[in-house]
From Swiss-Prot:
GO BP terms: acute-phase response; defense response to bacterium; immune system process
Species of provenance: Mus saxicola
SUPFAM superfamilies: Complement control module/SCR domain, Trypsin-like serine proteases
Source lineage: Eukaryota, Metazoa, Chordata, Craniata, Vertebrata
Listed name of the protein: Haptoglobin
Domain remark text: The beta chain mediates most of the interactions with both subunits of hemoglobin, while the alpha chain forms the homodimeric interface.
Signal peptide (from-to): 1-18
Record family assignment: Belongs to the peptidase S1 family.
Annotated localization: Secreted
Entry's transmembrane regions: none
Length: 347
């Protein structure tokens, strides 16, 4: 009673749910899963297929289909007994922001368009930004992490003083912070969460870039809370669309600064940003709406239309511009990718 090609497939939905077929894996005497009927000159082959929840994708060496062998082990032809994993999707917001007109400026209603945006509260209640890049790690600036700490503070000292929210005010616990080994020049730090967050339409990482998106004139988006032009903290989430600026003009604008940030009252904002090979500038003409204090650590998000994916071209480092200065300064994400991936893999 066997026939080649007659196959029964059990579809196991969810985030890697295991097959539970009772003591005898061949026994289908169950009301919810009746034993399949036999056919002439054929047989029933038992298969399971692993699939992932919405906003996750299957990572496996094979195709996710496992067959029960003679030793009653579930095996895949390519992966053997090694099970697949469900990894979080990045850069695929359910409600992406749409550029409906050629206007550079800000909006007060993001409608879940930037699910990677996190809000970080440092000591003494200062609000800054952070960017979700996986279901357990975020990027922010080293300056954000050191707010109200001395320069000698360690990562262990800093972590307990931070409060972090993702999604719609979802409080998450921080396990540790990791500073870039050259953070006085590369203004970046990583935050690891104690638990992985569930990825939803409201909480989703942004992708690290596979290419350089920062050609002058390229338009991207920055989101956050920050301050308005009156330097008051805002309670409403907002975003702004801005172009990548010409780097030479940005350097000239900030008095040719190539040293770490310092007080300089000839600068339009009274302080000099870090400008080096690891940074790029974003902005437009004077007196237009721009980012304000509190948005540092947020991603400059660019939509890759070929891949239909959003990637973080950079992380905002210098954010004291508001409407009085032309340019914000960002750390290039392409320069961070190797360090970020190595750090996440070993920690």
């Amino acid at each position: 009673m066997r026939a080649l090609g007659a196959v029964v497939t059990l579809l196991l939905w969810g985030q890697l749910f295991a097959a539970e077929l009772g003591n005898d894996a061949m026994d289908f005497e169950d009301d919810s899963c009746p034993k399949p009927p036999e056919i002439a000159n054929g047989y029933v082959e038992h298969l399971v297929r692993y699939r992932c929840r919405q906003f996750y994708r299957l990572r496996t060496e094979g195709d996710g289909v496992y067959t029960l062998n003679d030793e009653k082990q579930w095996v895949n032809t390519a992966a053997g007994e090694k099970l697949p994993e469900c990894e979080a999707v990045c850069g695929k917001p359910k409600h992406p922001v749409v550029q409906v007109q050629r206007i550079i400026g800000g909006s007060m209603d993001a409608k879940g368009s930037f699910p990677w945006q996190a809000k970080m509260i440092s000591r003494h209640g200062l609000t800054t930004g952070a960017t979700l890049i996986s279901d357990q790690w975020l990027l922010t600036t080293a300056k954000n992490l050191f707010l109200n700490h001395s320069e000698t503070a360690s990562a262990k000292d800093i972590a307990p003083t931070l409060t972090l929210y993702v999604g719609k005010n979802q409080l998450v616990e921080i396990e540790k912070v990791v500073l870039h080994p050259n953070h006085s020049v590369v203004d970046i730090g990583l935050i690891k969460l104690k638990q992985r967050v569930l990825v939803t339409e409201r909480v989703m990482p942004i992708c690290l870039p596979s290419k350089d998106y920062v050609a002058p004139g390229r338009v991207g988006y920055l989101s956050g809370w920050g301050r308005n032009v009156n330097f008051r903290f805002t309670e409403r989430f907002k975003y702004v669309m801005l172009p990548v600026a010409d780097q030479d003009k940005c350097v000239v604008h900030y008095e040719n600064s190539t040293v770490p940030e310092k007080k300089n009252f000839t600068s339009p904002v009274g302080v000099q940003p870090i400008l080096n090979e690891h940074t790029f500038c974003v902005g437009l003409s004077r007196y237009q709406e721009d980012t304000c204090y509190g948005d540092a650590g947020s991603a400059f998000a660019i939509h890759d239309m070929e891949e239909d994916t959003w990637x973080a071209a950079g992380i905002l480092s210098f954010d004291k511009s508001c409407a009085v200065a032309e340019y914000g300064v960002y750390v290039r994400a392409t320069d961070l990718k190797d360090w970020v991936q190595e750090t996440m893999a070993k920690k």
